[in-house]
């Protein structure tokens, strides 16, 4: 041993704590395998010869007072082979434990601290052996052993409901990490779940052949297994729920003796040798915490997943691929022509400003052309009026004239009244009696064709584009102002307004 680095002797008999060999600083490895400070404090609290230095606070659960801070710092420096250790440095180490929720400072009391035994998870504090014959005072709290705080599920995977709260830590978590709270999340167990046989301590991890009847479901026949020291950090949590985990349990039992962890961001340093089975939290498989992995549930899940994909045009979610799993075929009701090839229908992009105006103009011009659709066949392509045959124009004019002569007789209106009625918006379109209007068959009715959904004569391409974007009423007004021939026809009483006399005028007014 080095000079000045004498080690506190391990308690052999009687009471107190029994630490493993790795917890003591050896000469061969001066910088590793150190014992933790809070281990050391608990060790001092268990020894009667240090009652004048540090002791449990009378009447308080888990609270202790440092009576001689300098002596405690000196003892800690001797254990760590640091002669310059003082209470200032030691208190900084204690403040580190505040965030880890191992202990906290008692307010209003100097040099008084309290262990947080309710939330304390001690994976690195094994082999604690509190004996009934020890010299612990009555006011001292019972130091929790790992078996009193956690349950360890048996290896029999056919009884997943025996342990409601499984153990997340085994004795294998002592593998030279030395960090007292690396996996110290807040996990509580109900007092009703603690069996009487849970007093078997962590020596089970060293003696692999020892009886496991002291754990959770003790009546189950157990099989021999490798020592926990040889296993990874955690016990098998694959088939058992964890209430603090955001994921549900995995449906596939893991390999015996090898860790099977759920995919969790909290476990960033887990090895990658396990058979990862993604939990149903990643894929909506079931809502229960434990379920039987039968083909009926698989079939129901695959059916609902495929139907949701087909209905909402979503890309299918990834499904965990298990090597020994036979997936039943889908049974979605699909037409035979759709089963061969499925085409995803995409929504068209929103129309721009020009396309929107064009759609609105076509919607407004559609009701205007409805009275004449019975007599005129629908046109597919918009053509200038100059290219049309004048014979067809004359024939359509005669049909319109015959249609208007069957309506009745009223005196013709003036131009101003007609223009005012066009841009008015009556509550209900009135009934228009028509007048007998005679149109000479020799004159081409370009203005009559003009009042429909396409321009009659288009001198240039920009004007054609402007007319296409223009509402039909404004286009009609502009044609009226620019065409002197139409004015002469109207003054002589021979002008067909909107192709069907006053009836077309009423339709245009109703659409305003």
From Swiss-Prot:
Name of the encoding gene: ETV3
Chief place where the protein resides: nucleus
Alphabetical list of SMART domains matching this protein: ETS
Name of this protein: ETS translocation variant 3
PROSITE patterns tied to this protein: ETS_DOMAIN_1, ETS_DOMAIN_2, ETS_DOMAIN_3
The keyword Ligase is annotated on this UniProt entry: no
Modified positions (N6-acetyllysine) in chain numbering: 388
Crosslinked positions (Glycyl lysine isopeptide (Lys-Gly) (interchain with G-Cter in SUMO2)): 381, 388
